């Protein structure tokens, strides 16, 4: 697929597969940044377990940083997709210009803020005296590359929404390939330990950023990066549409941070660091599922927003059905694999029998409700793509609130291990709620869009 015109003409099922497969592949590969780092870190001689726990504490903070790229990328690409569906090239160009400006501003603000506050944040978010040096080293180096991380993440959405999913996938593959090759060189070859892991990640993000910017400044894309046409109304529109997916990622990070503090509190000095290490391994596995899920639901938003802008209601409905079908197939496969292969995954990080046994249990617990979670992802992202960000936001907040309450309450009655049941409890309840809300709203919302068309034609 080479142009946005295909988004309004090609068979819907073909479009969904053309966008979903490269996007989910890109997200899957993108997860390798953190997993490969953690895999090598876990095998550092003498202090691998402590270094892995330190990296685990940094993980949610790193995700929180890059989620600002998602905020602008998804909000901007949805807005731009609607404008392209309306055949308004000038407005689409303005959206990209304002998005680039916001990515630049967020990069500067986040870099300065996190460098100033990182020591206090790490201790607040679960670092112990033993793990703090490792977490501090990793986060300091990573934060200096915030600009490249946000640009690589945010700009890739604008590549995908213009009908270039394979290019978007290649943007991620460049960074991941570099990370895979450079990690062992910096960590073990140069004997840099956890510092080497962070440096390798930053270099990888620089390469992805350069590729994405070069493509969006080139001749192949219909809508290029320009400078000027800055408008507060456009910025507010982008932020409103991007806030729901941003909240999903940002609060995922905050929940992981909260989980680390709960595990440290209830695990105590004897088990706290061990529980966090096992949670880090299990969370790495979970990312192999949830990141491609984001790729499926987020990567196909361009189909929904373009046809919504063009007022092709039947294509919107058909797209949602096909997106949900792809998602259910993926989550069913991953649920089954989660029953049989966790041990082999855990062995990539550690050979300690106690860590292996408990990490496997956590993985199986985390993934209990992964199939119903398909409905939550597809319907929340679908509502956002159809200019219903407040509804999507409310559903996202509900899931996160349920997770926090469960993580806070369950350990006080059943011990530290009970905190791991917070995820499936929240996933199950929120998925049912999201399905009900979506089915009640979707037809009325699309009918309203059609009536707007008739009024405007008068």
Task: Map each language-model feature to its residues.
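Short alpha-helical transmembrane segments in multi-pass integral membrane proteins
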Residues: 1-23, 80-147, 189-243, 304-369, ...
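Residue-level signal for short hydrophobic patches within transmembrane helices
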Residues: 13-32, 36, 61-68, 144, ...
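Residue-level signal for transmembrane alpha-helical positions in Major Facilitator Superfamily
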Residues: 17, 32-33, 72, 113-117, ...
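Transmembrane helical elements of multi-pass membrane transporters/channels
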Residues: 18-37, 141, 175, 204-208, ...
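Hydrophobic/aromatic residues in alpha-helical transmembrane segments
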Residues: 21, 37, 76, 117-118, ...
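Helix-terminus/linker motif at the lipid-water interface of multi-pass membrane proteins
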Residues: 28, 32-53, 122-129, 185-191, ...
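Small-residue-rich hydrophobic transmembrane alpha-helices
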Residues: 52-112, 149-168, 278-336, 340-342, ...
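Short runs within selected transmembrane alpha-helices of multi-pass transporters and secretion channels
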Residues: 142-160, 168-179, 197-212, 293-297, ...
């Amino acid at each position: 697929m080479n142009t946005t015109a295909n988004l309004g003409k090609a068979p819907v099922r073909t479009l969904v597969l053309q966008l979903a497969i490269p996007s989910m592949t890109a997200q899957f590969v993108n997860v390798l940044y953190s997993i490969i780092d953690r895999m090598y870190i876990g095998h550092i001689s003498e202090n691998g377990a402590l270094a892995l726990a330190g990296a685990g504490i940094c993980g949610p903070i790193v995700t929180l940083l890059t989620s600002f790229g998602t905020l602008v990328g998804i909000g901007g690409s949805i807005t731009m997709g609607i404008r392209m569906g309306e055949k308004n090239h000038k407005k689409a160009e303005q959206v990209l210009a304002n998005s680039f400006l916001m990515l630049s501003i967020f990069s500067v603000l986040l870099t300065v803020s996190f460098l100033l506050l990182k020591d206090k944040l790490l201790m607040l978010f679960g670092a112990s005296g033993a793990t703090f040096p490792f977490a501090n080293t990793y986060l300091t180096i990573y934060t200096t590359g915030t600009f490249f991380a946000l640009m690589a993440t945010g700009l890739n959405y604008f590549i995908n929404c213009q009908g270039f999913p394979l290019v978007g996938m290649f943007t991620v593959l460049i960074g991941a390939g570099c990370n895979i090759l450079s990690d062992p060189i910096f960590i073990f070859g140069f004997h840099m330990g956890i510092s080497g892991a962070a440096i390798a990640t930053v270099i990888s993000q620089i390469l992805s950023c350069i590729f994405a910017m070069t493509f969006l400044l080139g001749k192949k894309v219909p809508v290029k990066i320009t400078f000027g046409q800055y408008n507060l109304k456009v910025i507010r529109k982008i932020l409103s549409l991007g806030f729901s997916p941003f909240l999903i990622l940002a609060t995922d990070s905050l929940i992981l941070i909260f989980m680390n503090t709960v595990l440290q509190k209830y695990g105590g000095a004897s088990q706290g660091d061990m529980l966090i290490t096992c949670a880090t391994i299990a969370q790495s596995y979970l990312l192999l599922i949830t990141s491609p899920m984001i790729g499926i639901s987020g990567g196909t938003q361009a189909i929904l927003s373009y046809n919504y802008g063009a007022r092709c209601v039947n294509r919107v409905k058909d797209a949602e059905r096909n997106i949900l079908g792809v998602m259910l197939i993926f989550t069913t496969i991953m649920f089954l694999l989660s029953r049989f292969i966790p041990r082999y995954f855990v062995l990539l990080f550690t050979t300690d029998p106690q860590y292996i046994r408990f990490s496997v249990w956590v993985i199986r617990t985390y993934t209990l409700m992964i199939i119903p979670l398909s409905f939550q992802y597809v319907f929340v992202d679908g509502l956002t793509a159809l200019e219903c960000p407040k509804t999507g936001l409310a559903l996202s907040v509900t899931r996160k609130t349920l997770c926090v309450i469960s993580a806070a309450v369950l350990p006080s009655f059943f011990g530290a291990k009970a905190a791991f049941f917070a995820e499936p409890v929240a996933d199950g309840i929120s998925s049912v709620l999201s399905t009900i809300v979506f089915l009640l709203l979707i037809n009325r919302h699309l009918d309203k869009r059609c009536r707007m068309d008739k009024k405007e034609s008068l």
